[in-house]
Amino acid sequence: MIKVFHYTSPGVRTHVANVYTSSLEEAFRLTQNIDGSWSRSQFFEDGEENSDFDNRVELLVPLIQDDNGKIFGLRSTMMFDEMELNGKIYVVRAAGFALKSITPFENINPIGVA
């Protein structure tokens, strides 16, 4: 399993998802909004299938809903976000990943509030 952390504001990273794979590249791909929303359910409110849904992705944060009931998914994983695999932290780079440290975050904000 890979833990996905999004950089939500300066100095604040939030554990947004667990992705059940052992490949950093696959975890990155599965947390991209390409033809839908990786963080939304299999079907949208209008019944249309969400082609970015994958049951290997476990969302850990609530999605935002506006006053009209419209639900907004999370952004795609991008450069400088981080992933944890086997206790090691990897930073997403323009091409690939860079090892950050061997110690997982100790002060993670689980719900994205500073």
Give the role of each language-model region.
Residues M1, P110-A114:
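Short intrinsically disordered terminal tails
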Residues M1-I34:
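N-terminal disorder-to-order initiation segments that are Gly/Lys/Arg-biased
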Residues R13-T14, W38, F97-I102:
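Tryptophan-centered short beta-strand motifs
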Residues A17, A27, A94-A98, A114:
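A sequence-composition feature that detects small, non-aromatic residues
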Residues S22-L85:
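Short, conserved turn/kink motifs that form compact alpha/beta structural patches or helix kinks used as
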Residues G73-N109:
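Short, compact, well-ordered microdomains
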